[in-house]
Curated annotation (Swiss-Prot):
This is Epithelial sodium channel subunit gamma-2. InterPro entries: ENaC (IPR001873), ENaC_chordates (IPR004724), ENaC_CS (IPR020903). The chain crosses the membrane at residues 56-76, 545-565. It comes from Xenopus laevis. It is found in: Apical cell membrane. It comes from the Eukaryota. Residues 77-544 are extracellular. Its main location: membrane. It catalyses: Na(+)(in) = Na(+)(out). Originally identified and characterized by its inhibition by the diuretic drug amiloride. It holds the Pfam family ASC.
């Protein structure tokens, strides 16, 4: 009985193996765990076929376990450290670049010889318009304004000035200021001042016509003769400056030690050597404090009026051009070191005889590029060439685009903007039609017909300083006398007159505090958030992790691909087998038909074939029939059921499947 019981137990163990904690060996226990656990990855180690797949899943599972231990260790260390963090930071802001320009671009004593004829013509024109009898400029200009014969009328020929008297239909009745003849003119009217041409009498203007087509004209009208003369004067002024070399223009401008009298920064003394020359086409010699060309940038350690830049500027109002600069003072612009100072558009003006205090607040803005916005990072993806050699800005792109169109349409470059390679500045002698071309092109630019506004895009990052300005009378009555004496002594030989407070301006520019504001864009839904949300949904509803995702990839992409490939292979093999069988069945089964009588070729001249009743004799039986010239169909090859060609294909298919499973 004992032997039979042992045999029964062994048979049960063989047919029904014990699993789980009752497994007899550690290998069987691990195998059972991997087959029944909810931990992803372990089951794939057991069920995967092929050593390569098995080792891949072993490595992935071990890496996941190592990451879990590492992260848990960090969490435990952080939890049991029982520490509190206190952060105290002392911030220092880089002091921005400050560009300072005199509103008068050139000393009149240095440029008067080049502008003498233009100034005479302008002065005489004003006398004709308003009937002045006294000289309109001071005698120190050394101009004989009463000698009309000495004044050339070339400027009035190029751009004729007129007085608008009346309107008849679509034509204007004007009085030419040179010939005093009344004529009717027609063309496109551009009103540069507020109001309407129909509602204004005695308006002043000038006419620009195409040199190649005199009937194509543009008429500019102004409600005030001051604005008309200034606009007319500036057109001729730019034409004269376009023919002067850069070296001569720098020599005619103000030097740093002439413009800057005293300087303090952060409580320390500075001088003209801390300023960098920057020549502006409209304001002449300007000077930039804390420029990147000086090397290390200065920083502000504290906020407040005592820790900024303090300068006293010598304006020298007596050297002002009366028709170009009608306001006296200076203009400043706060900007980043790698930005071009568009001081004519963004600058802040300083008055003479006052102390101007400007508090700054820095704002840094950063926008997201494509696909969140249409901004550009550095302008490299813009088709417009940067003519300023500075950091890309929208204003740089627009000006460069207009200058490019100016060179393409008019053949020359405008004086107010940088010169492109291979181009020349416009002047009457070489390009007599440039002013009309410029006015027409600028109108198209303003109306966004040149495509510059659609081509140029905003920069994704930029810095902006918000300025708060306050004014005070400077110097005071009690301190005026001694301060002017001291400053006159410091100017020394540069000063050839008695100094007054209207010749000076005091500037104090500083950070209000060292708190900068940062405005940045961030995507509300990025790839990290997307993956986290996907992982949360899969873990909540399917208890699925990253390893589970890899299992899905293996089954639904890799294994499914091989299953479909095997199915296609089986179909191909079956098609090949059926094709071979069909080829065998198409061969016809040819047999010799039974023929009797004279239709049988073997019975020719035979007694039996002749139908004779008597049996053949021995002699007639020996007479064999002659061979007939006829082809007897050959017997087809036999069909052997033992030739099983499909079995060979079946064996190849089995081998191929085994090869696939080995992967």
């Amino acid at each position: 009985m004992s032997n039979s019981g042992k045999k029964l137990t062994q048979k049960l163990k063989k047919n029904l193996p014990v699993t789980g904690p009752q497994a007899p060996t550690l290998y069987e226990l691990m195998q059972w765990y991997c087959l029944n656990t909810n931990t992803h990855g372990c089951r794939r180690i057991v069920v995967s076929k092929g050593r390569l797949r098995r080792w891949i899943w072993i490595v992935l599972t071990l890496i996941a376990v190592a990451l879990i231990f590492w992260q848990c260790a960090l969490l435990l260390m952080t939890y049991y450290s029982v520490s509190a963090s206190i952060t105290v930071t002392f911030q220092k802001l880089v002091y921005p670049a400050v560009t300072i320009c005199n509103l008068n671009p050139y000393s009149y004593s240095k440029i008067k010889d080049r502008l003498a004829t233009l100034e005479k013509t302008t002065n005489q024109t004003l006398k004709k318009i308003y009937g002045f009898t006294e000289p309109l400029i001071r005698s120190k200009r050394d101009l004989d304004v009463n000698d009309e014969n000495s004044t050339e009328d070339i400027f009035l020929k190029q751009i004729p000035l007129f007085r608008l008297e009346s309107i008849k239909g679509n034509q204007l009745v004007v009085s030419d200021l040179k010939t005093k003849k009344r004529t009717q003119i027609s063309g496109k009217v551009i009103q540069r001042d507020a109001g309407s041409v129909q509602d204004s009498d005695n308006m002043v203007g000038f006419k620009l016509c195409d040199a190649n087509n005199s009937s194509d004209c543009t008429i500019f009208t102004f409600g005030s003769g001051v604005n008309a003369i200034q606009e007319w004067y500036r057109l001729h002024y730019n034409n004269i400056l376009a023919k002067i070399s850069m070296e001569d223009k720098i020599a005619m401008g103000y030097k740093a030690d002439e413009l800057i009298v005293t300087c303090l920064f952060d409580g320390l003394s500075c001088d003209a050597r801390n300023f960098t020359l920057f020549h502006h086409p409209l304001y002449g010699n300007c000077y930039t404090f804390n420029s990147a060309e000086r090397g290390n940038l200065l920083v502000s350690s504290m906020g407040g009026a005592e820790y900024g830049l303090k300068v006293v500027l010598y304006i020298d109002e007596d050297e002002y051009n009366p028709y170009l600069s009608t306001a006296a003072g200076a203009k400043i612009l706060v900007h980043d070191q790698d930005e071009y100072p568009f001081i004519e558009d963004l600058g802040t003006e300083l008055e003479t005889g006052t102390e101007t205090s400007i508090g700054m607040q820095l704002t840094e803005s950063t926008k997201l590029s494509d696909p969140y916005s249409d901004c550009t990072i550095d302008g490299s993806d813009i088709s417009v060439e940067n003519l300023y050699n500075k950091k890309y800005t929208l204003q740089i792109c627009l000006n460069s685009c207009f200058q490019r169109e100016m060179v393409r349409s008019c053949g020359c470059a405008h004086y107010d903007q940088p010169l492109p390679n291979g181009a020349k500045y416009c002047n009457y002698e070489e390009y007599p039609n440039w002013i009309y071309c410029y006015v027409k092109l600028y109108k198209q630019f303003v109306q966004e017909e040149l495509g510059c506004q659609s081509t140029c895009r905003e920069s994704c990052s930029f810095k902006e300083w918000t300025l708060t300005r306050s004014l005070a009378k400077w110097p005071s009555l009690n301190s005026e006398e001694w301060m002017l004496r001291v400053l006159s002594w410091e100017l020394g030989e540069k000063l050839n007159k008695n100094l007054t407070k209207n010749d000076l301006g005091n500037l104090n520019i500083f950070y209000q505090d060292l708190n900068s504001r940062s405005i940045s864009e961030s995507p509300t839904y990025n790839i990290v958030t997307l993956l986290s949300n996907f992982g949360g949904q899969l873990g909540l509803w399917m208890s699925c992790s990253m390893v589970c995702g890899l299992e899905i990839v293996e089954v639904f992409f890799i294994d499914s691909f091989w299953v479909i490939l095997r199915q296609k292979w089986h179909k191909l093999c079956n098609w090949w087998k059926n094709r071979k069988e069909n080829e065998i069945e198409e061969i016809p089964d040819i047999t010799v038909p039974a023929m009797a009588g004279h239709n049988n070729p073997l019975c020719v001249d035979h007694p039996i074939c002749l139908g004779e009743d008597d049996p053949p004799t021995f002699h007639s039986a020996l007479q064999l029939p002659q061979a007939q010239d006829c082809r007897v169909p050959r017997t087809p090859p036999p069909k052997y059921n033992t030739l099983r060609i499909q079995s060979a294909f079946h064996l190849e298919t089995i081998d191929s499947d085994e090869d696939v499973e080995r992967f």
